[in-house]
Amino acid sequence: VPNHSRVTRRLSLQTALAAAVLLPLSHAGLSAEPAAAAEEEPAIAPRLDTMSFNLRYANTTRPNSWAVRRPVMRALLRQEAPHVIGTQEGLHRQLLDIETDLGPDYRWIGTGRAGGNRDEFMAVFYDTRRLAPVEYQHFWLSDTPDVPGSNTWGGGSIRMVTWVRFRDLRDGDRQFYVLNTHLDNASQYARERAAALIARRVAGFDPSLPLVVTGDFNVAAHRNAVYDTMLGAGLVDTWDTAAERGDLYATFHGYHPLTPGGDRIDWILTRPGTTAHRAAINTYASNGQFPSDHLPVQASLTLG
């Protein structure tokens, strides 16, 4: 297991984890530029390929067990190779499987929502050839966000956020945030309180840095107070702002036939100024087998 993932999981055992963890700056991927390069036209910023993916936890019940789904997910992720993936529902062993399947260039940051390695993670995977983490934090969607495993709003499950501040090694070491979450499936009250807490935390981020929010929000875009709160926090929906879009499907399918034009409950949001070139809902399946009960959503971005 790569060292950074081990460090992340070891730190996740500490109750003080809600305090942001600063990581040492690595000089990997940096090189001195010739003096002449400073006089050249600035390079166009490379696109950042992002994904939000509810993995469906590693269940053992067929016909959609993790053992059956894993090779399909491996094929999908290797084919798409996003630079950053905000995941939901992954269990510890499952995340190690995905890390192996993505290959040696990927790492992840996360902690179990019940604390340590217990229960589901909001793990953020990233391509180390493109991104280096600078700082990360976990907090819980409750009245006591610094307490691992806390759940005070009557939600059906513990809910949390993992966020990471990255350096983009291909874009002049530019920094940006990724915030990843999974809101409650049972309680609208818990979802609304969670969205309000996320909005407050986002307001505390450096306003000069781009922000990408990934998540399963368990409500339809455009038709819920949760969506209004997130956009009221100064975010925009990449599905709406993208220059090009794929076909719309309900992003939760539950292994049933896909629903064209259905509810989009998995979103990728950004601060204004970031350009969304393309947004898509990925319908990949192999011989009728989907990798999850959700469809991953993707956005190709230029941070701004």
Where are these regions (language model features)?
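N-terminal, active-site-proximal structural segment of metallo-dependent hydrolase catalytic domains
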Residues: P2-R9, Q14-L17, V21, H27-D101, ...
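Residues that flank catalytic or metal-binding motifs in active/ligand-binding sites
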Residues: P46-D49, R118-F121, I158-T162, R174-L179, ...
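Active-site beta-strand/loop signature of hydrolases that rely on acidic residues for catalysis
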Residues: D49-L55, M73-I98, F125, V164, ...
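Solvent-exposed loop/turn segments at secondary-structure junctions
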Residues: L55-N59, G90-Q94, R113-N117, R130-L131, ...
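Alpha-helical scaffold elements lining the catalytic groove of polysaccharide deacetylases
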Residues: N64-S65, Y189-A203
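N-terminal post-signal-peptidase region of extra-cytosolic proteins
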Residues: V68, V72, G110, P148-S150, ...
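Structured beta-strand-rich core segments of catalytic domains in phosphoester-bond hydrolases
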Residues: V84, Q88-Q175
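Metal-dependent phosphoester-hydrolase catalytic domains
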Residues: Y189, A203-L211, V219-G304
